[in-house]
């Protein structure tokens, strides 16, 4: 049994986070081709009996496209207006595509405040449990339309790790526009080497994770490493992989060397 098979076997609860750069064209308009491939893979996993939670960015990006804005809004009210419009566009798209496979989705919008007290945490957990028990695929996003800066998660990488911990997931997959974690920035160093497995999120690993997010997103590699820290500390395996690859999710669960695997603690 190889390392991947050891840590990626028997996945019953899976959280998949998809970033804005994977879901949208550079213009901000939704990339239906990519979304369809992601939906198909999730629908197939659902049919295998795996309980999948999708953490989806893209609300602001979809709003930018719908409102025909030339660039990402800079002020908080403008961002929130774009998110309010875009979240509806995003959910309508998911609802329509999953319905083609006979599957139902439910929306959960979370803020950091929702996880600030035990009572509210239990309430969120109960909502997830009820949806999953009814065979519904929860689609999660931060409530960008109303949340204030002081209580923002700020990126869905961190949010997805918190959700994975909350529902006691076996695996967290972060789909981005990069193949995984490199030993140096591949945009600067053409000889950068993709790291297959990370046994511990230490200072050396954090140093490899410099760099900003994409134009339409908020999370760079540093936020993904923070997500890995949260996930692995809670006994959850995590993989960073490229959402551009059509079968990335399937490849990961087939133990192929897709992306970078982060080994969980105490498992």
UniProtKB/Swiss-Prot annotation:
Substrate binds at residues 57, 144, 156. This is Glutamate 5-kinase. Pathway: Amino-acid biosynthesis; L-proline biosynthesis; L-glutamate 5-semialdehyde from L-glutamate: step 1/2. The gene is proB. CDD domains: AAK_G5K_ProB. GO terms for biological process: L-proline biosynthetic process. Its main location: cytoplasm. ATP binds at residues 17, 176-177, 218-224. Pfam families: AA_kinase. It catalyses: L-glutamate + ATP = L-glutamyl 5-phosphate + ADP. Catalyzes the transfer of a phosphate group to glutamate to form L-glutamate 5-phosphate. It comes from Clostridium acetobutylicum (strain ATCC 824 / DSM 792 / JCM 1419 / IAM 19013 / LMG 5710 / NBRC 13948 / NRRL B-527 / VKM B-1787 / 2291 / W).
């Amino acid at each position: 049994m190889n390392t991947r098979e050891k840590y990626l076997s028997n996945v019953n609860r899976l959280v998949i986070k998809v970033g804005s750069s994977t879901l949208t064209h550079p213009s901000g308009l939704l990339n239906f081709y990519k979304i369809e491939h992601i939906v198909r893979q999730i629908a197939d996993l659902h049919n295998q009996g795996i309980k999948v939670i999708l953490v989806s960015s893209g609300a602001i990006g979809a709003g930018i496209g719908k409102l025909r804005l030339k660039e990402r809004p800079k002020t908080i009210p403008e961002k929130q207006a774009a998110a309010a419009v875009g979240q509806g566009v995003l959910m309508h798209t998911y609802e329509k595509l999953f319905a083609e496979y006979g599957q139902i989705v439910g929306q959960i919008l979370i803020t950091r405040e929702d996880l600030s007290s035990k009572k509210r945490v239990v309430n969120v957990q109960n909502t997830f449990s009820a949806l999953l028990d009814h065979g519904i695929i929860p689609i999660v996003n931060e409530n960008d339309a109303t949340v204030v800066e002081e209580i923002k998660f700020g990126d869905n990488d961190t949010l997805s790790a918190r959700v994975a911990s909350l529902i006691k997931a076996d695996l967290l997959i972060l789909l981005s526009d990069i193949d995984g974690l490199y030993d140096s920035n591949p945009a600067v160093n053409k000889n950068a080497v993709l790291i297959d497995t990370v046994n511990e999120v230490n200072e050396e690993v954090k140093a490899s994770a410099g760099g900003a997010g994409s134009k339409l997103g908020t999370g760079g590699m540093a936020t993904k490493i923070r997500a890995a820290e949260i996930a692995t500390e809670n006994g959850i395996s995590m993989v960073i992989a490229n959402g551009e690859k059509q079968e990335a999710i399937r490849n990961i669960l087939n133990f192929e060397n897709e992306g970078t695997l982060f080994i969980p603690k105490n498992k």
